[in-house]
Curated annotation (Swiss-Prot):
This is Pre-mRNA-splicing factor 38B. Residues 1-12 have a biased composition (Polar residues). The lineage of its organism: Eukaryota, Metazoa, Chordata, Craniata, Vertebrata. Pfam families: PRP38 (PF03371). Residues 244-256, 292-328, 346-419, 448-465, 478-491, 498-520, 530-542 have a biased composition (Basic and acidic residues). May be required for pre-mRNA splicing. The modification N-acetylalanine is found at residue 2.
Amino acid sequence: MANNSPALTGNSQPQHQAAAAVTQQQQQCGGGGGATKPAVSGKQGNVLPLWGNEKTMNLNPMILTNILSSPYFKVQLYELKTYHEVVDEIYFKVTHVEPWEKGSRKTAGQTGMCGGVRGVGTGGIVSTAFCLLYKLFTLKLTRKQVMGLITHTDSPYIRALGFMYIRYTQPPTDLWDWFESFLDDEEDLDVKAGGGCVMTIGEMLRSFLTKLEWFSTLFPRIPVPVQKNIDQQIKTRPRKIKKDGKEGIEEIDRHVERRRSRSPRRSLSPRRSPRRSRSRSHHREGHGSSSFDRELEREKERQRLEREAKEREKERRRSRSIDRGLDRRRSRSRERHRSRSRSRDRKGDRRDRDREREKENERGRRRDRDYDKERGSDRERDRERSRERSKEQRSRGDGEEKKHKEDKEDRRHRDDKKESKKKHSRSRSRERKHRSRSRNAGKRSRSRSKDKSSRHKNESKEKANKRSRSGSQGRTGSVEKRKREHSPSREKSRKRSRSQDRSHKREHNDSKDQSDRQDHQSSQSGEPESQEKEHKSKDETV
């Protein structure tokens, strides 16, 4: 009930000039029926408020999901953008107002309006009527558009969908104000899929107000106080019984005249009523039976003419509907042809543009290919040059490396030869030096021993001579001794011995220096064999 509060203030008594005209027509109809309630005057806005869920239109979820998933709603109705296009679609496509198409729901032999199932129960193929009803809801109709639906004169199904739109979207407190002036509407329509359930607009509206069920779905619930109020008001408005005889014919004629008028504002054409004829006939009864018979014949003739006029009117209506359908189809075909021609022209222009673009793209691609080819050829040339250079450099480098290796090997052979020669020369020099040293050492030892022995002998001799001659000779012996000692032979021998000692010392020092140098070189070169040989030679010398 929270959703009802904003709608109650803004939409208390909806009315329209067309509805007022319809009520005036019903009031003008004579005989039997109760008087309709006049429309309440008042200003109301054109914006029509919605009641309940503003996204689902208060439809059953199963029906709504089938509507949204149907290809008819997604493809064909999506192209319809205006109110008039949807109304034309209703005129050509709707043949019943049941939510499901015939034979699409399996109710397992259940009978009745709902098939023994409350709500939806089982799904099926949703009808075009409910798809178009939800399409109207997506357009957010105004008050004027809704009144145009419920007062439409071309098809009763347009009016039926308008009333169903009101039942689903308007507050329950406003339903009586919407439906009151149409409760006695006698226009027939077949509401069941496949036919077989003909009812009038008034009967359909009474079922909308008193019952929640509509075939295999449910309308939005009406609050209990509002429902009681509606029931009481319906009791005060009983159904009109169809009249027999001339008055029934007159009622049908007036209904036809009302249907004939496109807008409800048009005044009804004045016709001769059967009441007037009856009053005139009673007034003329006193003149005789002949006048009464004449009057009766005239009345029969008038009824026959009226029937013929009705048949003509029906034929005209059929021809008009056919002509309208043809005109609409022709206009649509013309529009389609124009749109197709325009689309063809546009497509031709687009094709030309696309061709030009493709040509330009091809030119650009050719240029790019040529440029790429040139760049590729240049790159290949550069690569070949670089390869040749690298090959030359590699060949040069290989030759240089070979030469360098050969030079290194030659140097190594030379160094090895030199070292071997040096080793042989060193070994020979060492052997020679060793031999010379050994010889010199023998000579020195021999010379030293000889000198010592000679000196010892000389000293012993001198001592003996001194002892023997000390007493006899005296000073002469001493002088001679001095002379002998200072003789040149003695001095020469002494000098020789001293020079030999000096030379022997020098040779010994030279040999030591050479041996030290050789040891130093051998330690630096790291040759263990030479070191062992030198050690052996040193040991031998030692």
